[in-house]
Swiss-Prot record:
Compartments (UniProt record): Nucleus
Transcription regulation recorded as keyword: yes
Alphabetized PROSITE patterns for the sequence: ANTENNAPEDIA (PS00032), HOMEOBOX_1 (PS00027), HOMEOBOX_2 (PS50071)
Protein origin, superkingdom: Eukaryota
UniProt motif Antp-type hexapeptide: location: 134-139
Name of the molecule in the record: Homeobox protein Hox-B8
Species: Mus musculus
GO cellular component, one term: nucleoplasm
Length: 243
C-alpha cells in the first residue's frame, strides 16, 4: 500500500490527540493529554490523580509532566453549578410529603399508633368485660336423670279441661292445639292431663278399657246408676245387723 493512499485515507479523520475520550463537553477543555485526570464526585472539591502512564491510541506510551496542577475553568464552572452540568436548568424537587395533608405528616407512624390503640382496647376489654345477654335457649338444659317439677293447673284450667274431657275423652291434634292456646298451656301438658284423667276414670269404674265412644260411656253411667240403689240397700242391711 502506497504512502500516498495511506496519507489520503488518514487525512479524512482526526488525529490521535483528538481521539482521546472527552468526558465533558466544555469549550475550555483542550489538550487534556498533558493534564492530570480529574475525578468529580458528590463532594464540593474536585480530586485528581496522577497516573504514571496513559496508553496512547496511536503514538505509544508517553510520560506525563509533573507540573503543578492548575484547575480547569471548565471544571469549576461544571462542578460549581451541578444543575447546568449538561446544559439544562436544575429541576425543582419537592419534598415527599409536600403535597399531602399536614395532619398525615404529623402522624407518620400510623401503624404503631393503630397497634397501640388496639392493644389498649384489648386490655380494657379484659379488665371490664361487658355483661352478655342470656337467652332461654342459651341456658343449660336439665339433666336426663333429673326429675321435673309437678305441673299445677289453676281452677279455670282444670274446669275447662274437665268440660272437654266429658265432651270427648280423646282429643285430636287440631283440637289439642286449640285447647292449649285457649288455656295458655303447651300441647304436651294437655296431652298428659288427658292421659292421667283417663287412667283415673278406669280406676274409679274398675274397667280395663276406657270407652272409645260417647254411647258406651252413657251405658256405663246408666249401669252405675242402677247399681247405686242396690249398694244403698246392702249398706242399710249391714247397719241393721250391727244394731
Amino acid at each position: 500500500m502506497s504512502s500516498y493512499f495511506v496519507n489520503s485515507l488518514f487525512s479524512k479523520y482526526k488525529t490521535g490527540e483528538s481521539l482521546r475520550p472527552n468526558y465533558y463537553d466544555c469549550g475550555f477543555a483542550q489538550d487534556l493529554g498533558g493534564r492530570p485526570t480529574v475525578v468529580y464526585g458528590p463532594s464540593s472539591g474536585g480530586s485528581f490523580q496522577h497516573p504514571s502512564q496513559i496508553q496512547e491510541f496511536y503514538h505509544g506510551p508517553s510520560s506525563l509532566s509533573t507540573a503543578p496542577y492548575q484547575q480547569n475553568p471548565c471544571a469549576v464552572a461544571c462542578h460549581g453549578d451541578p444543575g447546568n452540568f449538561y446544559g439544562y436548568d436544575p429541576l425543582q424537587r419537592q419534598s415527599l410529603f409536600g403535597a399531602q395533608d399536614p395532619d398525615l405528616v404529623q402522624y407518620a407512624d400510623c401503624k404503631l399508633a393503630a397497634a397501640s390503640g388496639l392493644g389498649e382496647e384489648a386490655e380494657g376489654s379484659e379488665q371490664s368485660p361487658s355483661p352478655t345477654q342470656l337467652f332461654p335457649w342459651m341456658r343449660p338444659q336439665a339433666a336426663a336423670g333429673r326429675r321435673r317439677g309437678r305441673q299445677t293447673y289453676s281452677r279455670y284450667q282444670t274446669l275447662e279441661l274437665e268440660k272437654e274431657f266429658l265432651f270427648n275423652p280423646y282429643l285430636t291434634r287440631k283440637r289439642r292445639i286449640e285447647v292449649s292456646h285457649a288455656l295458655g298451656l303447651t300441647e304436651r301438658q294437655v296431652k298428659i292431663w288427658f292421659q292421667n284423667r283417663r287412667m283415673k276414670w278406669k280406676k274409679e269404674n274398675n274397667k280395663d278399657k276406657f270407652p272409645s265412644s260417647k254411647c258406651e260411656q252413657e251405658e256405663l253411667e246408666k249401669e252405675k246408676l242402677e247399681r247405686a240403689p242396690e249398694t244403698a240397700e246392702q249398706g242399710d242391711a249391714q247397719k241393721g245387723d250391727k244394731k
